[in-house]
């Protein structure tokens, strides 16, 4: 039996802190470093799993080259640093994180409370975490925008949602989640562009979206994560960190696989229903 989400988040936080338990330095610096390692490592893991998933659904090497761009300089971990951390804690934190993503609805803001707790802890309001949009407020803003868009349900073509100061994706995740409630065909219309000046926040936003795409198999039309100053660095000077455009072949094969799965479940239900009727008729 799995633990309640609150306890899983607590266990995840404790596991993250253990990543740098062997490091020297102050408590604050060790925790900040642990969070950075956790986010970058898990983003790398999830991106590898996304590419493997695309291959599973028929994407060729050429299609992957054309549809997936990753700037490794943002997520690479120094080998010297990697050799000095608690690898067991890192692996455990990755396992717990994936379990939390699986347990929550698709495109949930898993990292908000985690980052807020770590960055604001003992900071007396001086940490960057204070600027992350609270999930309740993000959902309210999204709902207000939703009401104003009368043609939302009639959309049949990809459309863009852009956030220039995205943080960990707090404002764009609810939009993706609302479309996901309708169905996979709706998230496949989302062209998300998220930007932040902080490279770690860009990694966090990318991790949140990619992990849901992998774990819940809800593909986006495109995800573009940009690391730049939105006021001074505009195209073509803005820097794309991650660009993922789901290949059409993958979208088609995912639909076929899920349709087949639903058909098999329906057949099993009919079979069980038939057996039940026979037993009842005999009695």
Q: Which residue ranges define each predicted feature?
A:
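A short N-terminal interaction module
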Residues: 1-119
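Histidine (H) residue identity feature
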Residues: 22, 56, 67, 112, ...
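Conserved aromatic-histidine-acidic binding/catalytic patches
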Residues: 26-34, 99-106, 126-133, 163, ...
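Generic low-complexity, intrinsically disordered sequence content enriched
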Residues: 91-94, 141-144, 279
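Class I SAM-dependent transferase core
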Residues: 109-136, 143
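Conserved S-adenosyl-L-methionine
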Residues: 134-235
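S-adenosylmethionine
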Residues: 202, 208-283
């Amino acid at each position: 039996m799995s633990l309640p989400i609150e306890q899983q988040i607590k266990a995840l936080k404790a596991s993250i802190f253990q990543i740098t338990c062997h490091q020297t330095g102050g408590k604050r610096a060790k925790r900040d470093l642990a969070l950075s390692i956790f986010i970058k490592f898990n983003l790398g893991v999830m991106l590898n799993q996304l590419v493997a998933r695309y291959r599973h659904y028929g994407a060729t090497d050429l299609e992957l080259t054309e549809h997936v761009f990753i700037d490794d300089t943002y997520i690479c971990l120094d080998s010297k640093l990697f050799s000095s951390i608690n690898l067991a804690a890192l692996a455990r934190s990755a396992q717990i994180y994936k379990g939390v993503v699986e347990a929550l609805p698709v495109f949930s803001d898993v990292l908000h409370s985690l980052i807020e707790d770590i960055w604001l802890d003992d900071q007396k309001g001086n940490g960057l975490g204070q600027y992350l949009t609270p999930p309740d407020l993000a959902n309210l803003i999204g709902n207000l925008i939703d009401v104003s868009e009368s043609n939302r349900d009639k959309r049949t073509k990809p459309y863009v949602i852009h956030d220039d100061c995205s943080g960990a994706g707090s404002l764009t995740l609810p939009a993706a989640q609302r479309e996901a409630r309708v169905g996979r065909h709706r998230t496949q219309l989302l062209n998300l562009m998220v930007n932040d000046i902080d490279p770690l926040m860009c990694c966090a936003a990318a991790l949140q979206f990619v992990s849901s795409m992998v774990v819940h198999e809800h593909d986006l039309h495109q995800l573009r994560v940009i690391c730049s100053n939105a006021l001074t660095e505009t195209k073509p000077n803005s820097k794309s960190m991650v660009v993922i455009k789901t290949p059409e072949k993958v979208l088609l094969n995912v639909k076929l696989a899920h349709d087949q799965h639903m058909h098999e479940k329906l057949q099993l239900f009919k079979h069980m229903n038939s057996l039940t009727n026979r037993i009842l008729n005999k009695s």
